[in-house]
């Protein structure tokens, strides 16, 4: 029997280009009609506009309310739906035979039989099977044939109904060098210590001005890091990594919180390396901090619930997530497409946005990886990374697109760079013929700088070589409007015209191909990312990891903006300790305020470094902000000094 996407402890593989189309098994109620299923109802914040205005005040240096954060109880009393509103929803759903439990201040867990769910939300649920492929086991899930409709009597209080579709939906944002180039790799020591591909958090600290904080005794002590993830991991890997680096850590520093039963046992196919990276990097940058790992199944329901769990608990001062999907991911199935300014019809992005607003009001700092698909993030969902076909040499999507949740205005998005230095590659097995790639300055991570190497290796184009569209996720959101902290900043851009995607591609192998839709042109959207660190696998890091296939190993050559998110998480813990235990909240206004003041880059003691070279296959680095790399890279100790002056 195949594992089910609704069963607890069943590790599900994350989707990629190799995932087969699902087989429609027919109506769910005919397959397992007596087995209850669950959905999460995300409750709307009744005074969302007031909450967003408060977040702006709390996050803006110089505002009288700057950093006057609310406690959990204060937030609930002021902004959460009332008990009367919740009772009305519970009563309304009880009319359909559904059971309701309040799982947080703003979420409800609804359980019932498939037929009752269908009646409540006006859908027909089908069961689907994804066959095994390669070393990846098959699994089943359920999904509606049409979009759900929220019952009229409760619709005003509901932001989202999430979980009627239980398939794995999100991708880890770790990246490894393409196989053709990895085989050609030859190691040369980097200028700052370890060789490229073998860097550690100690090298990160040297490159980005963290060491001065360590010399002051700052380690993140007294702080709690939160990791939000959709795959489990092996904690001993992280402890082995920290021990190898000589870091002194508390043996009881990690606490695991299983959300919705947890994601199942660790496995390569489910993305366990991602969680391993998150814990090793954040906990290595802040070795004195405690770590809470909130891990949920890789479903829409798990995605929303992992945010709700971490934010409602309010135990971690700083959080990060390194999973995502392209911004319009939920419009690919069962369109019609909705107005981009109002969010998706099922409300996943709206539900998470309201949770992120709450996090900022409570003083929690939240980071997201900006993506590894350059300016074309949709390729992670539309299948760019499948086998190269000479008959379809341009099978990748050229739709400019950004990753979610990095595109949300209430989160800090981490982009990626390539470190300066020389990279050596072998052009034959004996390595008697070599090719050197010289990167004279730290630059935007975009693998087009390797096109000469690809030509030398005989690859006919960047897709065949495996380098397109690898690079720092960045661009312009067409779902989230430009936030106040980006208004007036040079380099902020509007969305480009002529961007098309194909909607309604269907779930199952015999579904019809859908229509083409134009994304909004010249839309004044939120620009992504905000800040960057090294993320190029070719100037990347080692990971201590227990593979479900090959066992424990020390794996070199890893990168992706998945490293940047947890590194920022660790940095935030250091900053909190440096600032005498203060919470930092949403960091975007302080960061952008530096650029708007003109003091961000002007002297050796400046908090930001210009990344004026390179591109992410469309957007170029420049002096100041760019949608390729954000504001540049951070000098952490210098930024800490500036933050101290704002308290």
Predicted feature locations:
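An often Trp-containing, charged/polar helix-loop segment at the C-terminal end
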Residues: 576-629, 647
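Polar, glycine-rich mid-to-C-terminal structural blocks
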Residues: 379, 407-409, 413-482
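Sec/Tat signal peptide C-region and signal peptidase I cleavage site
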Residues: 2-7
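Active-site-proximal helix/loop microenvironment
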Residues: 556-568
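Basic/polar, cationic surfaces and motifs that engage anionic cell-wall
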Residues: 618-622, 634-639
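Substrate-binding/charge-relay-adjacent region of secreted/lumenal peptidase catalytic domains
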Residues: 8-104, 109, 114-369, 373-375, ...
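Short glycine/serine- and small hydrophobic-enriched flexible loop segments
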Residues: 569-577
